[in-house]
Amino acid sequence: MSKFIDPEKLEIEDRVVAINRVTKVVKGGRRLRFAALVVVGDKNGHVGFGTGKAQEVPEAIRKAVETARKSLIEVPIVGTTLPHEAVGVYGGGRILMKPALEGSGVAAGGAVRAVMELAGIDDVTSKRLGSNTAVNVVRATFEGLKSMRNAEEVAALRGVSVDHLAE
């Protein structure tokens, strides 16, 4: 279980990734609602996502931002990129994320780009494998980011020094 990150202490920026129009057919006709997917982050290693549903788009976005601020995770960053390669899987969505050389930029599409930019990762290469549904792609990206470990964490888990890992 990851530790709680207080969103009040961070300068958080949000980005709407997707808005879906959802209809429910009832006896009297169709009921229209909107579902919003929002990613929030401080561009300094903290990122979260949330979904919200409401009858109006602004209200759905507000609910999604509220949920996203409660689901912040910390992402290990080495320089301007990821510490190592990772694959995130959620449902049918799979994301392959690879560290890139400084100056490469964010080579990622749509939902993954939003997550990477708001997490503060400036150089990364990613490939979406499987489902391209925005919600599954974002969840898979988060699963991949949660699996990331920096050298200090790996050394501590193995009970060796960081210098020993470098050999």
From Swiss-Prot:
Residue span, S5 DRBM domain: 12-75
SUPFAM superfamilies named among the record's database cross-references: dsRNA-binding domain-like, Ribosomal protein S5 domain 2-like
Keyword rRNA-binding recorded: yes
Record's keyword terms, sorted: Ribonucleoprotein, Ribosomal protein, RNA-binding, rRNA-binding
One Gene Ontology term from the biological process aspect of the record: translation
Gene Ontology cellular-component annotations: small ribosomal subunit
Domain of life: Bacteria
Known function: With S4 and S12 plays an important role in translational accuracy.
Quaternary assembly: Part of the 30S ribosomal subunit. Contacts proteins S4 and S8.
Protein family per UniProt: Belongs to the universal ribosomal protein uS5 family.
Domain notes: The N-terminal domain interacts with the head of the 30S subunit; the C-terminal domain interacts with the body and contacts protein S4. The interaction surface between S4 and S5 is involved in control of translational fidelity.
Protein name according to UniProt: Small ribosomal subunit protein uS5
Native source species: Pediococcus pentosaceus (strain ATCC 25745 / CCUG 21536 / LMG 10740 / 183-1w)
